[in-house]
Structure formats: structure tokens, C-alpha cells
């Protein structure tokens, strides 16, 4: 099997699980499920990216599977935008603005935390080798 084919299969498998996790969040927490899914996704993508940067021999199928597959299916930019528009149309523009700004601010903060956590875990794992 070619590397390209393996990457596509990995993305599909990980996306399946990311989609299930997101569906569970949305069914369990509704509107807040989308918010927290996106925030957690910001953390996870940064975490995996910086963790894998600490190692030279990480398989590409794993990096694209977790990043593009799992996190890509777990997060949703389109639903985020739709939720903002729904709040505007429901004449609650303050709620829309708070949701929009908190998503951007918390997303950035959690990505920053994920970056630092990924670097630290990577350093710890390298020291154990």
C-alpha cells in the first residue's frame, strides 16, 4: 500500500472517531458542545503538532490521522459561524458577539496551552528514550 493511500485510510478512520466524539458532545451539550468541541480541538491540534515536532520518526499516517482526521472532524468552523448567525437572527446580538469573541479568545489560549503541553510531553518522552 502506498504512503498516500495509507494516509487517506488513516484520515478516514480517525475522522470517524472524531465525528462520533463531536456528535456526542453536540447531543449531550447542544450549543455548548460546539463551543467546547472547537476549544478542545484547538488544544489537541496544537498539542499533537508540537508533540510530534519533538520526534523525527513519527509516522505520517499518525500525524495526518490525528490532525486532519480526528481533530478536523471533531471541530467545526461552519457550525460555529452558523451559531453566530442564528443568534443574530434571533435578535440576541450580544450573545452572538460574546460567543464569537470567546471562541476566538479561548481557542487561541487553548492552542497556546496545547503547544506548551505538547513540547513538554515531547521533552519528557525523549528523556525516557
UniProtKB/Swiss-Prot annotation:
Entry superkingdom: Bacteria
Topology of the protein relative to the lipid bilayer: Multi-pass membrane protein
Record-level Gene Ontology MF annotations: fluoride channel activity; metal ion binding
Summary of activators and inhibitors of this protein: Na(+) is not transported, but it plays an essential structural role and its presence is essential for fluoride channel function.
Residues annotated as transmembrane: 11-31, 35-55, 62-82, 94-114
Residue positions binding Na(+): 72, 75
UniProt KW Membrane keyword: yes
A GO biological-process term: cellular detoxification of fluoride
Keyword annotations from UniProtKB, A to Z: Cell membrane, Ion channel, Ion transport, Membrane, Metal-binding, Sodium, Transmembrane, Transmembrane helix, Transport
Keyword Protein transport: no
A cellular component annotation (GO) from this entry: plasma membrane
Catalysed conversion reaction: fluoride(in) = fluoride(out)
A matching Pfam family: CRCB
Compartment(s) where it occurs, according to its Swiss-Prot or TrEMBL record: Cell membrane
Protein function: Fluoride-specific ion channel. Important for reducing fluoride concentration in the cell, thus reducing its toxicity.
Family: Belongs to the fluoride channel Fluc/FEX (TC 1.A.43) family.
Complex formation: Heterodimer composed of FluC1 and FluC2. Neither FluC1 nor FluC2 alone catalyzes fluoride efflux from liposomes.
Protein name per Swiss-Prot or TrEMBL: Fluoride-specific ion channel FluC 1
Organism: Lactobacillus acidophilus (strain ATCC 700396 / NCK56 / N2 / NCFM)
Taxonomic placement: Bacteria, Bacillati, Bacillota, Bacilli, Lactobacillales
Gene: fluC1
